[in-house]
Amino acid sequence: MTMDLPTTDDRPVWDLWLSMYHAPAVTAAIELDVFEALATAPATHEELARRLKLSERATEIVLPLFAALGLLSRYDGRYQLSDVARLYLLRGSPYDWGGLLNRMGPSSPHHAAIREALKGERASTTGAPGDRPSDAWAAGHVEIEQARVIAAFMHSHSIAAALGMARNVDFSGVRRLLDVGGGSGCFCIALAQRIPQLRCTIMELPAMCEVAKEYVSAAGLADRIETGAVDMFRQEWPRDHDAMFFSNILHDWDFPTCARLLAKAHAALAPGGRVFIHESLLDDSGAGPLTTATFSLVMLLGTQGRQFTYAELAKLLGDAGFTDVGATPSYGYYSVVRATRR
C-alpha cells in the first residue's frame, strides 16, 4: 500500500502535544527560584545550576524553552529575565501571577517530574532509571509486547515526516541504506516508495525487527526492505551498505554515546559512504524554536539525551571522521544533517 504525502504538515499537532509541558516547566522553575535567581544576576546555565544546586543537564535544557516562551533572553551566553517574567513571575512584583500558578503547578504530574529532574533526583516521567524508553536499548533487550507499543508510538508521529523527508532530501546515489534503530521501518518504507532502486535494512533489537516486518509487509515492500537483529552498542554493524540513517536516535543519548555510535557508523562505511541524521534542531541562539525546545524537555524526562543544534551535530560528525557536512529542512519541524565518510 503506497502512502501519499499529507496535504498539510503536522506542526499544529506537535504544538498541541508538547504544549502540555509549558506550564508545568514554568511552575517547577518558580518553585525552585529559577526566575528569582536570574532577577539577581544573568547567568549561564552552568552558573545558574551551581547557584541553585540544580542538575546542569536539566538547566541547560529548560532555559532555551523559557527563552522560546518569551520569559528569558540570552546575550553573550547568559540568560536574563524578559520584561514579562520580571513583571509576572517574581514574588515581589505587584503583578505576580503566583497566586494562580503556584496553585496550578502541583496538579500536573509533569510539574513534579520536571522539578525532580531539575533537582537531579529523577530522570524519567515513568519512574526510576530502568523504566525510561531508551533503557531497553541500553540493556539490549525489549519484549515483543513493549516493541509493539514503541513501534506504534514512533510510527504515529514519524510517518508524515518520513514521507516528507523522502520527497525533500537528496538521497541520489544511495543504493543500500542501513536504518540504525529503525523502529517500525517507516523511514525505509517512505524512501523505498520514493526510490525504486533503493534497498534498505532496518537494524534493530530482535523483537523490534519482528514488529517492523509487519509494517514492511503491510506496505508491500518486503522484497526490498529487510531487518537485521543487531544490538547497536554491543555488536558489529553490517559493512555492506553505502549509507547510514539515524532518525530520533542520537537525541536519546549523551554526547559520548553519540560519538560512539557515529564512530561505529564511520567504521561500517567505505570511503565516500554517507550518513543522514534526521532530528528537530535547536537554534544556535539558545532561544528555541519553541516546539523543539519542548521536545528537548521530553528527552530530559525520558532519555539520556536532548535535542541538538546544527553546530553540535556538525562537530560530532567531524570528530567521527565525516566531512562535507550540511543540513536540509525536511518536513515540519525536522531537518536532515548529512555528511560523507572520508
Predicted ranges, named:
Residues 4, 10-32, 36-42, 50-51, ...:
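Conserved Class I S-adenosyl-L-methionine-dependent methyltransferase catalytic core
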Residues 1-74, 171, 176-342:
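Alpha-helical subdomain
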